[in-house]
UniProtKB/Swiss-Prot annotation:
This is Probable amino-acid ABC transporter periplasmic-binding protein y4tE. One of its GO terms (cellular component) is periplasmic space. Residues 1-27 form the signal peptide. It is found in: Periplasm. GO terms for molecular function: ectoine binding. Its main location: periplasm. Belongs to the bacterial solute-binding protein 3 family. It comes from the Bacteria. GO terms for biological process: amino acid transport; ectoine transmembrane transport.
Length: 300
């Protein structure tokens, strides 16, 4: 019997994926024994309980479910490798699929133990959760209609003459606001899966996302393409580059610290590099991961 526990207060959008496969809502509810939340504070608590809950936002290539319900992606695979080094087997990971905007509130409410969504480290987020050291670094990208008839090659281009879609809770909102995009020209979608239809139907003129995400989406439909070449946005004189990491509840410092120790060792290996290359990350993006620390990113 699975160790899955579901809170009565868990958001309806969340889905639990025991042992890497999607569990139906009915099956999950049948396993409900109490309103006990996840929220493990220490690694020893996780081991004593027998499982760990990890939330993902179904975003390629970071962490997503394939057509068979298997959880895949660079973030998910790194989490598996690191946790295995800490004595937690992959089959003892309970995956939770939710929206990106629900990740931090879910951590704060102890609905899961950690996230594996490549969430960019930002000072305002550091006030709400704690992060591991970075395990990814990425620039920006943009999805446009096939042929790019309006010749969009930067967020600034769209800011001046079009509507741009972003995922709810994503960093791109901050960028659009800094670039002066009017609120009425910002289209918010719930998940990356909605990006192709938003652009293909003309609801939005472009979709702003991490470069790897935009590139992956472009491969999925002949109605859209990646805007190339693309110029990363410049805000306050700085080219925008993000560093992503795993996040934890603020009370879970012991769990985060133990995870960090194993992550930093794994980050030095060729296996780590090959894993990211296998998901389409550029060598220069992988090389940039150690350039920033979580402490620096939280304070700047």
């Amino acid at each position: 019997m699975t160790h899955l526990k579901i809170s009565k207060t868990a958001p309806a959008v969340a889905r639990f994926l025991p042992a890497g496969r999607i569990a139906s809502v009915a099956a999950a509810l049948s396993l409900f024994l109490s309103a006990q939340l996840a929220g493990a504070v220490t690694l020893e608590e996780v081991k004593a309980r027998g499982y760990i809950t990890i939330a993902i936002a179904n975003e390629m290539p970071g962490s997503y479910t394939d057509p068979n319900g298997e959880v895949k992606g660079s973030e998910a695979d790194v989490a598996r490798r690191v946790l295995e080094k800490l004595g937690i087997k992959p089959e003892n990971i309970q995956w939770v699929v939710t929206t990106f905007g629900s990740l931090i509130p879910g951590l704060q409410a102890n609905r899961f133990d950690m996230t594996a969504a490549g969430m960019a480290i930002r000072p305002e987020r550091c006030e709400k959760v704690i992060y591991s050291e970075p395990n990814s670094s990425y620039g920006e990208g943009m999805l446009v209609i096939k042929g790019n008839p309006r010749n969009f090659h930067s967020y600034e281009d769209v800011a001046q003459q079009g509507k741009i879609a972003i995922m709810a809770g994503a960093d791109q909102l901050r960028m659009m606001q800094a670039l002066g995009v009017p609120n009425e020209n910002i289209i918010t979608i719930a998940a990356n899966a909605d990006a192709i239809s938003a652009v293909a139907t003309g609801r939005a003129d472009a979709y702003a996302a991490a470069a790897s995400t935009a590139a992956d989406l472009a491969k999925k439909s002949d109605k859209v393409e990646l805007a190339t070449p693309f110029q990363d946005p410049v805000i306050d004189g700085k080219i925008q580059r993000s560093w992503g990491a795993f996040s934890f509840n603020k009370e879970s410092a012991d769990l985060r610290d133990k995870f960090n120790e194993a992550l930093l060792e794994f980050r030095k290996t060729d296996e780590f590099k090959q894993l990211l290359l296998g998901y389409g990350y550029l060598p220069e993006s992988i090389a940039a991961i150690p350039d920033k620390t979580t402490k620096e990113l939280c304070s700047n």
